[in-house]
């Protein structure tokens, strides 16, 4: 089953025309610049905004249908909502906030949720005594305790400083693995998408510009305007293949005939991971180097060549290199290098990636 969102609405100068299908049991990220319409989209799903026309359904459960006259009120849609700010009741304890609005007592589920988010020690405290990260964990738990069919999260880390973001992120990763509830996650952070999402939809000016599996959208032309020169990268779903105990490196299998040595990753062999390789950390050679400090030298074929203009006379060339069937690596080189190597689509080359260039910030456990 899927989540179907189709509606038209005019708000201010933005004409929304949304037609979006999202998977039922995954984290789907909505990405785009501020004012693109991401929050409006989830407010329509929740019932906080009523569109002029359209249809919204979670599987067979219809929330809104303008033709049939269906418009369930917010409290009957079985949707949990986590806002940018926690919106806790200041005069209630944490436990009081968690139980507010809970219709059926379920001690086992309460224990499971509070354990998952590590907030049991906070139950007797009041919001004024909590850190920003603790407040957001309580807000997430409150949303889960309503036993929703869908969880909406509107930039839940946006108001937190970096230490608090690092505090909350592991709990969000746990959600994707342990909670069997579809999550629609609004963000403008590529790092959060890398760590959390399985599906990605890009929203711009009230329209869905592209939507699909994260790896496919990440590699598409639709992502290029959102990535700076240093952000251009390839995203891989791989598995830990082996560890090199002497040199603190881990070999990651990207495809049957393609592996990378990267800085050591904690995990057992066969652990599925997601790996980001920045395009400006990849170089190209026409012949296999015989003596080099670079640990990864991979045979490849030039798949595509594109010019990239970053403005202010900054020009670069993005080269897509095929490492194996369905496995592609982006390399960013200068126009000078392109001319000097005389690269053409179909050329056999070698991709070089430093083992130290892929660090912990580029690695995440693959969401299930």
Swiss-Prot record:
Give one GO molecular function term.
ATP binding
Taxonomic superkingdom: Bacteria
* UniProt catalytic activity: molybdate(out) + ATP + H2O = molybdate(in) + ADP + phosphate + H(+)
Task: Provide the ABC transporter domain boundaries.
Answer: 1-230
Q: InterPro entries from the entry?
A: AAA+_ATPase, ABC_transporter-like_ATP-bd, ABC_transporter-like_CS, Mo/tungstate-bd_C_term_dom, ModC_ABC_ATP-bd, Molybdenum_import_ModC, Mop_domain, P-loop_NTPase
Residue intervals passing through the bilayer: none
EC id: 7.3.2.5
UniProt cross-references to SUPFAM superfamilies, sorted A to Z: MOP-like, P-loop containing nucleoside triphosphate hydrolases
Q: Where does ATP bind?
A: 32-39
Q: Where is the Mop domain?
A: 291-362
Keyword tags: ATP-binding, Cell inner membrane, Cell membrane, Membrane, Molybdenum, Nucleotide-binding, Translocase, Transport
| Classification via SMART domains | AAA (SM00382)
Q: Which GO terms describe its cellular component?
A: plasma membrane
Q: Which Pfam families match?
A: ABC_tran (PF00005), TOBE (PF03459)
Subcellular location(s) per record: Cell inner membrane
Bilayer topology: Peripheral membrane protein
Q: What function is annotated for this protein?
A: Part of the ABC transporter complex ModABC involved in molybdenum import. Responsible for energy coupling to the transport system.
NCBIfam families hit by this protein: modC_ABC (TIGR02142), PRK11144.1 (NF008355)
User: Could you describe the subunit structure of this protein?
Assistant: The complex is composed of two ATP-binding proteins (ModC), two transmembrane proteins (ModB) and a solute-binding protein (ModA).
Family to which this protein belongs: Belongs to the ABC transporter superfamily. Molybdate importer (TC 3.A.1.8) family.
- What name goes with this protein? Molybdenum import ATP-binding protein ModC
Recorded source organism is Vibrio parahaemolyticus serotype O3:K6 (strain RIMD 2210633)
What lineage is this protein's organism placed in? Bacteria, Pseudomonadati, Pseudomonadota, Gammaproteobacteria, Vibrionales
> What gene does this protein come from?
modC
């Amino acid at each position: 089953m899927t989540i179907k969102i189709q509606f038209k609405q005019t708000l201010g100068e933005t004409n929304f025309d949304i037609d979006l299908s999202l998977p039922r049991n995954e984290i789907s990220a909505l990405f785009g610049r501020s004012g693109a319409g991401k929050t409006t989209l989830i407010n329509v799903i929740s019932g906080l905004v009523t569109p002029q026309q359209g249809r919204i359904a979670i599987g067979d459960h219809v929330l809104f249908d303008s033709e049939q006259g269906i418009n369930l009120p917010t409290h009957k849609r079985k949707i949990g909502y986590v806002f940018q700010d926690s919106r806790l009741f200041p005069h209630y304890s944490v436990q009081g906030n968690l139980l507010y609005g809970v219709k059926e007592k379920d001690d086992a589920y309460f224990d499971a949720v509070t354990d998952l988010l590590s907030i049991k020690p906070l139950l007797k405290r009041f919001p004024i005594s909590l850190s920003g990260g603790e407040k957001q964990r309580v807000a997430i738990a409150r949303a889960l305790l309503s036993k929703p069919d869908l969880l909406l999260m509107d930039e839940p880390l946006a108001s937190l400083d970096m230490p608090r973001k690092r505090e909350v992120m592991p709990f969000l990763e746990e959600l994707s693995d342990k909670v069997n509830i579809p999550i629609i996650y609004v963000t403008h952070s590529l790092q959060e998408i890398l760590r959390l999402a399985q599906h990605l939809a890009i929203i711009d000016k009230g329209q869905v510009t592209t939507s699909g599996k994260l790896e496919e959208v990440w590699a598409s032309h639709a992502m290029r305007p959102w990535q700076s020169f240093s952000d251009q990268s390839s995203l891989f779903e791989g598995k830990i293949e082996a560890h090199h105990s002497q040199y603190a490196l881990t070999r990651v299998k990207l495809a049957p005939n393609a592996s990378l040595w990267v800085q050591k990753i904690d995990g057992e062999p066969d652990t599925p991971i997601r790996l980001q390789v920045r395009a400006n950390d990849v170089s190209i050679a026409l012949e296999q180097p015989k003596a080099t400090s670079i640990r990864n030298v991979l045979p490849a074929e030039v798949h595509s060549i594109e010019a990239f203009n970053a403005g202010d006379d900054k020009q670069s060339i993005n080269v897509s290199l095929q490492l194996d069937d369905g496995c592609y690596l982006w390399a960013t080189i200068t126009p000078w290098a392109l001319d000097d190597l005389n690269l053409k689509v179909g050329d056999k080359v070698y991709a070089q990636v430093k083992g130290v260039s892929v660090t912990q910030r580029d690695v995440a456990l693959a969401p299930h």
